[in-house]
Amino acid sequence: MLLGVNIDHIAVLREARQVNDPDILMGMYAAIIGGADQITTHLREDRRHINENDVKDIINHSRVPVNLECSINEEIIDFVCKFRPHRATLVPEKREELTTEGGLNLSTAGLENIINRLKNEGIKVSLFIDTSRENIDIASELAVDCIELHTGTYANIFNMLNSNIALTKYSIKNYEKSREDLQNLLKDELANIKHLAAYAKGLGLKVAAGHGLNYQNVASLTKNSEIFELNIGQSIIARAIFVGMKTAVCEMKELIK
C-alpha cells in the first residue's frame, strides 16, 4: 500500500508565527527520504497554510508524485492547470472549517467540465467522496482516475472507542455512546469502507483513503483491502515533532506495508 504524506501542517506551524521556518521543502525532502510514495498538499482558497509559492516549489522539486487537493474554485483550477501536479484531488471547502469535513457534492454544477479540463492538461483526477455506492457510481460515470474515500467517520468512532478523547473537551458528540455501540459502529464502518473499495475497483477506479488516519487506526484498513493508497498528514507531522520526519514516515510505512 502506498503512502501519501500531507505536509500542510508544516505550513500551519510556519504561519502560526508568520515566519519562514519551518521550511516546507526541508519537510518534503525528509518525508521522501523516510519513504513517502507521494506528497499531498491542499491549496485552500483562504491560503491559511499552503500558498501558491509553496505549491510551485513542491511540484518543481519533488521526486515523487504530487497530489494537490483543491476546491473547484475557478482561480484555483486555473492555477492547477498552469502548474500541473501529478494528480488533483477535488475536495469541498468551507472557510469556517478547521479541516475538510466531508466529501465533495458530486452534483455540483460544472464539475464534469472541470474534470475534463484537468484531464486535458494531463493531470490525473481524483474525487474526495463520502462512503456511499451512489457516490462511487457517479465518480465512475465522470470517468475520473481515482477516488479517495473519506475515512473521517471511521477515525472518529475509533478515537472515541480507543482513546480518552471522550473525557476531554474534544469529545465527539455524535459518538458519545456505549462501548458496545461504538464497537458495532466501528465494525460496520470498516466493513463498509472495504466493501466500497472493492466495488469501486471493480468499476475500474483506483481507490485511496484518508482523513483522520493515524498510527493507531491504519492497520485495520490495510488488511484484505482494495485500497491502494492512504493519504495521512496531521498524525505524521505530530509524531515528527518527537522523532523527526524521516522516522515518523518510516514508522507509518511499516504499519501499512
Swiss-Prot record:
It comes from the Bacteria. 1-deoxy-D-xylulose 5-phosphate binds at D8, H9, R44, H49, T99. Keywords: Cytoplasm, Pyridoxine biosynthesis, Transferase. The keyword Transferase applies. It holds the Pfam family PdxJ. It is found in: Cytoplasm. It catalyses: 3-amino-2-oxopropyl phosphate + 1-deoxy-D-xylulose 5-phosphate = pyridoxine 5'-phosphate + phosphate + 2 H2O + H(+). Gene3D superfamilies: Aldolase class I. Pathway: Cofactor biosynthesis; pyridoxine 5'-phosphate biosynthesis; pyridoxine 5'-phosphate from D-erythrose 4-phosphate: step 5/5. One of its GO terms (biological process) is pyridoxine biosynthetic process. The active site is at H42, E69, H211. Its EC number is 2.6.99.2. The record marks E148 as: Transition state stabilizer. GO terms for cellular component: cytosol. 3-amino-2-oxopropyl phosphate binds at N6, R17, G212, G233, Q234. InterPro entries: Aldolase_TIM, PyrdxlP_synth_PdxJ, Pyridoxine-5'_phos_synth. PANTHER family: PYRIDOXINE 5'-PHOSPHATE SYNTHASE. Catalyzes the complicated ring closure reaction between the two acyclic compounds 1-deoxy-D-xylulose-5-phosphate (DXP) and 3-amino-2-oxopropyl phosphate (1-amino-acetone-3-phosphate or AAP) to form pyridoxine 5'-phosphate (PNP) and inorganic phosphate. Belongs to the PNP synthase family. HAMAP family: PdxJ. This is Pyridoxine 5'-phosphate synthase. The gene is pdxJ.
